[in-house]
Design a protein with these regions (language model features):
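N-terminal interaction/assembly modules
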Residues: 1-135
Length: 135
């Protein structure tokens, strides 16, 4: 079984490919996709209008369309886990700070050098807005 980090990254890649290629989400997932990955990707797509509105609001001076597609996908998955832990399968949802850490690590590995700080800033602002706490 793949680790949760790998499953999150698989969901991010599926969303990224779907956005970039304009293909249905189901076409970007392997047949033997893990239930956790499938739920993350599908729920991020289902909640996308809400998640994108949060990204728009907190990405000051950055229209959503200017944010790199991979960074948008990372943000969507992290925001989903932060705001809707009930829609993701599993006994123990990741705490919001953990979702932020996972997103930052994914950005460090796969995005440009400025992406981790950008992602941290947006996710931290959402956390602050929702709970009064920051990372």
């Amino acid at each position: 079984m793949a680790r949760r980090t790998e499953q999150r990254r698989a969901a991010v890649w599926a969303l990224y490919q779907s956005d970039l290629l304009g293909r249905p989400l189901g076409d970007t997932l392997p047949r033997d996709v893990h239930m956790f990955t499938l739920a993350l990707a599908e729920q991020a797509r289902e909640h996308q209008p809400e998640l994108d509105e949060l990204i728009r609001r907190h990405a000051k001076d950055w229209p959503l369309e200017r944010i790199a597609p991979l960074e948008r996908s990372i943000l969507r998955v992290a925001l989903l886990e932060m705001l809707h832990p009930d829609v993701v399968p599993g006994d123990q949802p990741i705490p919001p700070e953990g979702a932020i850490d996972e997103a930052i690590e994914t950005a460090k590995r796969f995005c440009g050098s400025g992406a981790p700080a950008f992602i941290n800033g947006i996710l931290g602002a959402v956390l602050q807005e929702r709970t009064g706490a920051g990372p």
